[in-house]
């Protein structure tokens, strides 16, 4: 079908929104995956309600999926949307504040009933006027009715037919943005064809019906194209942060030549890592779904003692429960990676929302002097790299490492260039195969201060580990004051020495200027976009973004000294800023903090930076 009034855009933000059962996550995923296959840069933001099943039709039960796709790499899912697809009035109301001026709004006309409007908290029967959308491009197709009409010959009951209405909405968006239907068709055939081919065919018919509706209605004045992004040559796929983390851990095990063991307890939003690792039996991965968080980490510690690359995964509440056993891993000096996918807290908090509020817990949340290496990933795709790095540091330095991600990058997705494992270095743990002359001494150390890793069952390498303090050489239990002081200092020095084994800190932008923006972890995309926009306006603003938290990389002091002002931006109340004050006391740190369960927006960051430059 030939299209007229086609406009080319650099980037577009679409949000699909509806009840939890409306299939918005699948709709957004199919649209974003299709865009990725067309070569667009993409960044996504799945947004789930915190309740398992909030009351249907209420604002509390709204589920959303935001897609930012463009003709260049997209670093974040966008602040405000160009297009909102709302399956009911509650979705319209919940997302009103996220609309760009003049945005296109598509809402299912069948859902605009007195009952639905009352559930959503509207005071009138005209949601468009009540929300001030008269100047917006509002399209109100009867999506549910047209889906029923399109599928009336399938033989499916009404409940099954109505479940396909999200695919009708997807078809509309495919037409508007010149997306082919082929990938979505293939996905549906793969998912349903064997077990329920009628459902697969019904969903395909719904996509086609939505596409044809959009093509034949006069309510869409324009259609749009978005050119592919220039990408480095290679093989790409879309990946979310949890899956990338699992694969990075598998890669670390492969490069170390050791089996991977994961002992974990399911917890939102980290469970997908355990599920993905459980699929990798072909790579020799062993997983245990333990009865609780404590059992999960303790099985991992036992696996590390037995010669495995050991991992446990969790979120903030689970990290609290693992704290005593994490101290045991520090005392035994066994390699262990703890992946903490941060969520809103404290306590149960906001299980499906993002936050960066576990940093202080990761740094200090254990009894005694108990330092660990702390690493943080910045995007869905680089979760692979930093999971690999966490494994490398844990095994080569014989210490636990906490890898911090968060709900935003764990569930979000973006294109990922699949690396060649030849580009990754071999991981060389200090494994002891034979007893040295004079006998094996478990706490004799190498140049990194790492002790030898001797596996059970080898003659002459018998030794004990445990939570009681050990002699600094022989490893037997010791309560000697001088020995305890030495071991405390040595464990701290070992973690500090890891700074020699990580990249020096870098700056995005000029090496000196009026304002240095400091961030860490999953906020990088928003911070970098804000800094780039200000630099384009002639402002002397740069970004120092941290992935290695403890120890801090070399070069930080020299970088900070070259800027007039420093502002730390975090999705917490200033935990990294306080950590910097502790370690680099000569600098003054401004703060911009947010604890709303949402990522930063570029707009609010720029407003803060502008105020600091006045």
Give the location of each predicted region:
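Peripheral docking tails and interdomain loops at the edges
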Residues: 20, 143-146, 152-157, 171-174, ...
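Short glycine-rich or small-residue beta-strand-to-loop segments that form or flank ligand, phosphate
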Residues: 12-19, 169-171, 260-263, 310-313, ...
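Gly-rich Lys/Arg/Thr-decorated short loops/hinges at beta-loop-alpha junctions or inter-strand turns
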Residues: 50, 149-151, 219-234, 252-259, ...
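Flexible, low-complexity linker and terminal segments
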Residues: 239-248, 256, 386, 391-614
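Active-site cofactor/cluster-binding pocket
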Residues: 1-256, 554
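A glycine-rich phosphate-binding loop feature that marks nucleotide/adenosyl-phosphate handling sites
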Residues: 48-49, 188, 206, 227-231, ...
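Conserved thiamine diphosphate
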Residues: 78, 133-136, 140, 144, ...
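Thiamine diphosphate
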Residues: 11-100, 247, 252, 260, ...
């Amino acid at each position: 079908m030939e299209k007229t009034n086609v406009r080319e855009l650099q980037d577009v933000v679409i949000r699909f929104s509806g009840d939890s059962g409306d299939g918005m996550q699948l709709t957004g995923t199919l649209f974003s995956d299709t865009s990725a296959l067309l070569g667009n840069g993409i960044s996504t933001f799945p947004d789930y309600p915190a309740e398992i099943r909030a009351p249907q039709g209420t604002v509390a039960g709204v589920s959303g999926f935001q897609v930012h796709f463009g003709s260049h790499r997209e670093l974040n899912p966008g602040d405000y949307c160009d297009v909102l697809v709302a399956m009911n009035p509650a979705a319209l109301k919940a997302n009103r504040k996220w609309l760009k001026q003049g945005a296109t709004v598509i809402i299912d006309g069948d859902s605009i009933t007195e009952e639905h409007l009352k559930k959503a908290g509207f005071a009138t029967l005209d949601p468009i006027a009540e929300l001030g959308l008269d100047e917006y491009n509002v399209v109100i197709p009867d999506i549910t009715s047209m889906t029923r009409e399109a599928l009336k010959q399938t033989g499916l009951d009404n409940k099954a037919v109505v479940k396909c209405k999200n695919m009708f909405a997807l078809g509309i968006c495919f037409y508007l943005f010149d997306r082919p239907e082929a990938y979505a068709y293939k996905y549906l055939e793969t998912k349903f064809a064997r077990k329920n081919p009628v459902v697969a065919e019904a969903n395909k018919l719904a996509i086609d019906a939505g596409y044809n509706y959009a093509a034949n209605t006069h309510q869409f004045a324009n259609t749009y194209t978005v050119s592919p992004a220039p990408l480095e040559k290679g093989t790409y796929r879309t990946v979310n942060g949890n899956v990338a983390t699992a694969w990075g851990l598998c890669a670390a095990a492969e490069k170390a030549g050791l089996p991977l063991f994961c002992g974990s307890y399911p917890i939102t939003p980290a469970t997908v890592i355990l599920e993905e690792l459980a699929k990798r039996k072909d790579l020799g991965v062993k997983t245990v779904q333990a009865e609780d968080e404590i059992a999960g980490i303790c099985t991992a510690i036992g696996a590390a003692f037995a010669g495995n690359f050991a991992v446990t995964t969790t979120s903030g509440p689970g990290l609290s429960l693992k704290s005593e056993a994490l101290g045991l891993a520090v005392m035994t000096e066994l390699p262990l990676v703890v992946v903490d996918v941060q969520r809103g807290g404290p306590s149960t908090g906001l299980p499906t929302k993002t936050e960066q509020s576990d940093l202080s817990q990761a740094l200090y949340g254990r009894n005694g002097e108990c330092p660990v290496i702390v690493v943080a990933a910045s995007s869905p795709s680089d979760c692979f790299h930093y999971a690999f790095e966490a494994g490398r540091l844990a095994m080569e330095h014989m210490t636990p490492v906490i890898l911090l991600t968060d709900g935003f990058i764990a569930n979000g997705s973006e294109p990922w260039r699949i690396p060649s494992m030849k580009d990754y270095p071999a991981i060389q743990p200090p494994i002891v195969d034979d007893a040295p002359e004079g006998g094996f001494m478990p706490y004799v150390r190498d140049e990194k201060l790492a002790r030898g890793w001797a596996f059970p069952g080898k003659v002459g390498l018998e030794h004990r580990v445990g939570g009681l303090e050990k002699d600094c050489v022989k490893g037997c239990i010791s309560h000697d004051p001088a020995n305890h002081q030495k071991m405390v200092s040595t464990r701290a020095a070992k973690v500090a020495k890891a700074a020699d084994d990580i990249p020096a800190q870098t700056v995005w932008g000029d090496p000196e200027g009026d304002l240095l923006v400091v961030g860490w972890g999953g906020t990088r995309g928003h911070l970098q976009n804000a800094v780039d926009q200000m630099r384009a306006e002639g402002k002397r603003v740069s970004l120092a973004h941290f992935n290695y938290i403890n120890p801090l990389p070399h070069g930080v002091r020299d970088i900070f000294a070259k800027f007039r002002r420093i502002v730390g931006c975090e999705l917490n109340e200033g935990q990294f800023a306080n950590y910097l004050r502790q370690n680099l006391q000569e600098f003054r740190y401004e703060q911009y903090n947010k604890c709303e369960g949402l990522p930063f927006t570029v707009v609010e960051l720029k407003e803060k930076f502008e105020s600091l430059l006045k």
